[in-house]
Amino acid sequence: MTEPTQPQAAVAADENQIVAERRDKLRALRDQGIAYPNDFQPTHHAAGLQTEYADADKEALDAKALDVAVAGRMMLKRVMGKASFATVQDGSGQIQFFVTPADVGAETYDAFKKWDLGDIVAARGVLFRTNKGELSVKCTELRLLAKALRPLPDKFHGLADQETRYRQRYVDLIVTPETRATFRARTKAIASIRKFMSDADFMEVETPMLHPIPGGAAAKPFVTHHNALDMQMFLRIAPELYLKRLIVGGFERVFEINRNFRNEGVSPRHNPEFTMMEFYAAYTDYRWLMDFTERLIRQAAVDALGTATIRYQGRELDLAKPFRRLTITQAIQKYAPNYTDGQLSDDAFLRGELKRLGVDVTQPAFLNAGIGALQLALFEETAEAQLWEPTFIIDYPIEVSPLARESDTVAGITERFELFVTGREIANGFSELNDPEDQAARFRKQVEQKDAGDEEAMFFDADYIRALEYGMPPTGGCGIGIDRLVMLLTDSPTIRDVLLFPHLRRED
């Protein structure tokens, strides 16, 4: 381990000194028996007061003489002789405390002067407006509820180090209003989705997180062991097969918002643990799903942000406009127009072009790949990142869609779509394959690919086949990446910005 630089060492020494001084203050509070009281109940919150009395002038507030009780974290403090001010932040916003020895008593005032930024404080008093027009609480009672032993980051620089923001999210939330706004928007978006689904007569369900067989997606699972049953199990990579079992069982519209786990890489748009919403509706197809998904995302934006027109990384997006629909080859030729129809149907050309673009076509997934899979790989290299406006890419090849229904009109193509916005996938849906014999044959092909070295190929799920043999009605199903959707709505460039506690390497 390398030695810290002198500035780092100096900062650490300063912080250690501050912590030591604060521990001494806490020790004194313990000696007085008042270290961590738990008998204060706020009657109001900062944002509510700021909103309700935004237009009330000084005279109106004085006449009303509203008694309030407010608690929160002290973010700023100005001691000015016989009158002091503190900016206090609760879960809703900030409000100013006005403190004088005449109102709270000399002993409390002297104690207040020794309190530190970051301390959790509480006050009772009367709401008023200062001569400078600041809505404030004129404190008649002031208490320290919890001592902060560690100092907050400098108010002008905040948490400059991005990794520290992720690792110490609790500090980031304290000092960064934008972070708090991001996660409030996330909560609003998820609440909007739940209401949208409920209004459409969907039932929310919970399915297992531990699976005896990983299924429902092409991904590498996390493996664990169930001690009581003495069996290998897998953290789920997708809830799909369980949700479709519920369709078989007679629940005709179901959805689940929960975690999936995939033992794969970390990137600005990938995290091994992530939140998905999957939903399934009997007697629908992929066209119905696209219409429904478009309306759902539009409504989530309106409910979370108040508008369907958003800005992402400096560019405007109008989610109120109809989403485009393109086939894979149409998208390739739109963004790479030099490719001809003949070239896009030529196995040797596609393999050579992919190799030129840096794709390793010798990996197991490409060994027996057909034209459709090669076209999809070329789409990912040439067009995917260009799909800024919301776009449904449709007509996916059957060989990369083992759970999707084959088209009635075009052999080798499935009734499947993926929704792309700002160059990244947001949703994936299709008309479900409900033919048990066809599904079993596709599972067997997946097993062959797994035996050939493709770690992401699916297992054969005999119980799922048994469920289909009881009969599943025509069904449409879709998965929406909640984290990526929130990235879009909150102008967040990386998935870590929308996860409260993203995975990081250990601190060593």
Swiss-Prot record:
Q: Which residues bind Mg(2+) 1?
A: E418, E425
Cofactor(s) needed, names only, are: Mg(2+)
| InterPro entries per the UniProt record, alphabetical | Aa-tRNA-synt_II (IPR004364), aa-tRNA-synth_II (IPR006195), aa-tRNA-synth_II/BPL/LPL (IPR045864), Lys-tRNA-ligase_II (IPR002313), Lys-tRNA-ligase_II_N (IPR044136), Lys-tRNA-synth_II_C (IPR018149), NA-bd_OB-fold (IPR012340), NA-bd_OB_tRNA (IPR004365)
Q: Which UniProt keywords apply?
A: Aminoacyl-tRNA synthetase, ATP-binding, Cytoplasm, Ligase, Magnesium, Metal-binding, Nucleotide-binding, Protein biosynthesis
Looking up Pfam families in the UniProt record yields:
tRNA-synt_2, tRNA_anti-codon
Q: Can you state which reaction this protein catalyses?
A: tRNA(Lys) + L-lysine + ATP = L-lysyl-tRNA(Lys) + AMP + diphosphate
Location in the cell reads: Cytoplasm
Cofactor binding note of this UniProt entry = Binds 3 Mg(2+) ions per subunit.
Q: Per the record's keyword annotation, is Aminoacyl-tRNA synthetase included, yes or no?
A: yes
Q: What is its EC number?
A: 6.1.1.6
**Example GO molecular function term?**
tRNA binding
- Name the Gene Ontology biological process terms: lysyl-tRNA aminoacylation
NCBIfam families linked to this entry: lysS_bact, PRK00484.1
Q: Which family does it belong to?
A: Belongs to the class-II aminoacyl-tRNA synthetase family.
- Assembly behavior: Homodimer.
Q: What is this protein called?
A: Lysine--tRNA ligase
Q: Which organism is it from?
A: Burkholderia pseudomallei (strain 1710b)
